[in-house]
Amino acid sequence: MGDFFFILLSTALVNNVVLVKFLGLCPFMGVSRKTDAAIGMGLATTFVLTLAAGASWMVEALILEPLDLTFLRILSLILVIAAIVQFIEVVMRKLAPGLHRALGIYLPLITTNCAVLGVALLNIQEGHGLASSLLYGFGSASGFTLVLVIFAGMRERLAQLSVPGPFAGAPIAFISAGLLSMAFMGFAGLAPN
């Protein structure tokens, strides 16, 4: 039980995929203008990342390693991730059309989100079992969602302020991301790397 808590804590806060591993920066900067879109993207990514982490373990342990096909790892993981994202898109279009429209092009781009593929590959590299893999994916996705929603809140607040001209837009967003990253550095003492 302690190992599961450690995995969740370290992936969500200490080794955050966005702020420490620099994975998923495209949706981090692109979808973080509105909190609603950030929450939707975070939830969709959480579902995809958790399923992809478990599916990547199954593909690796049940197909690639026994058949000595590990050279097909990246290709097979991309296919698995693409199938999961297509499933999410169909479900979201049916159940939440407003959210589907708000996410726009970023929803199909979860397929190419380097955070999803990166977490799947890191999961395999660290040699987790199935339960640990699912928790590793969920923790990474929770950290991604947490950072995305906090950053969206910061950007919404900044949009209401009068920012000096040279800092308006992307510069103030990068400065805010740096400050957020420094704040998350405070979690570094909670768990060893």
Curated annotation (Swiss-Prot):
Complex and partners: The complex is composed of six subunits: RnfA, RnfB, RnfC, RnfD, RnfE and RnfG.
Annotated protein name in UniProt: Ion-translocating oxidoreductase complex subunit A
Cysteine pairs bridged by disulfides in the record: none
Pfam family, one: Rnf-Nqr
UniProt GO cellular component terms: plasma membrane; plasma membrane-derived chromatophore membrane
Membrane topology type: Multi-pass membrane protein
GO BP annotation list: electron transport chain; nitrogen fixation
Gene that specifies this protein: rnfA
Lineage summary: Bacteria, Pseudomonadati, Pseudomonadota, Alphaproteobacteria, Rhodobacterales
Ranges annotated as spanning the membrane: 4-24, 39-59, 71-91, 102-122, 134-154, 167-187
Domain of life: Bacteria
